[in-house]
Structures are given as structure tokens and as C-alpha cells.
Design a protein with these regions (language model features):
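Acyl-group transfer acyltransferase/transacylase scaffold of fatty acid/polyketide systems
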Residues: 1-124
Length: 124
């Protein structure tokens, strides 16, 4: 395994987030989790959310557990994923994808222009 230092402003994905996890758990109890319509991979266990009943506990776990990024990407690829879209400023995740496999198609959406670029790429 290899660790990469990322510039972040919070101790995400570490035990220092346990108090936030407790608060998140209480908030998630107040809302209803809907049935899963689309496959989503949890970075807590690098597997698809099995049911709506497990969503809350996995969301809480991912706050304080290391991200299983490479395993999650591998799972997505083995399940037929052909492209990844990173939404938000920067291209950190697209860069990390290329470290796993330079052939992976990845796109970044951070503004209207990049959204149009991605839309055009998927029209073909």
C-alpha cells in the first residue's frame, strides 16, 4: 500500500472524526434513507451499498476510516464502469485515477464550461 499526502483542512478519514461520526449518526436517524436506485460504492469497505439499511452505518464509518480508493476504483472497473466524473474544484481524484491506470477515462466538472465539455464527451 502507498500513502499520498493530500492538502486538506480537516482530519477526515481518521479516528479524530469519531465525534463527528456520532453526531452524523444521530442526524441520519432523523431522516429516512430511500431505496438505492443506482449502484454506489462505499469507500468504507470498497463494495456496493448492499441495502438502504446499511447506508447510515457505512456513511458514519467512512468519516473515520481510511479511504479504500484503489479498491473502490478496481471494484467499479470490474463492474463495468467506463468513465469517472469528478465534481468540484481541482482535479485531485482524476490524478489519483491515472496513478491506478493511465487508460482510465476521467472528467472533471468545476464550472459551466467543463460541464459542457463532459456533456459533449458523452454524446458520442
Amino acid at each position: 500500500a502507498k500513502a499520498i499526502l493530500l492538502p486538506v483542512s480537516a482530519p477526515s478519514h481518521s479516528p479524530l472524526m469519531d465525534p463527528a461520526g456520532e453526531r452524523l449518526s444521530k442526524e441520519l436517524e432523523k431522516i429516512g434513507i430511500m431505496d438505492i436506485k443506482y449502484p454506489v460504492i462505499s469507500n468504507a469497505d470498497a463494495d456496493f451499498y448492499p441495502s438502504k439499511d446499511k447506508v447510515s452505518s457505512l456513511l458514519v464509518k467512512q468519516l473515520s476510516m481510511p479511504v479504500r480508493w484503489e479498491e473502490s476504483v478496481t471494484k467499479a472497473l470490474s463492474s463495468g464502469t467506463e468513465a469517472f466524473i469528478e465534481i468540484g474544484p481541482g482535479k485531485v481524484l482524476c490524478g489519483l485515477l491515472k496513478r491506478i491506470n493511465r487508460e482510465i477515462k476521467s472528467f472533471n466538472i468545476e464550472d459551466v464550461d467543463s460541464l459542457k465539455t463532459v456533456q459533449n464527451a458523452f454524446k458520442a
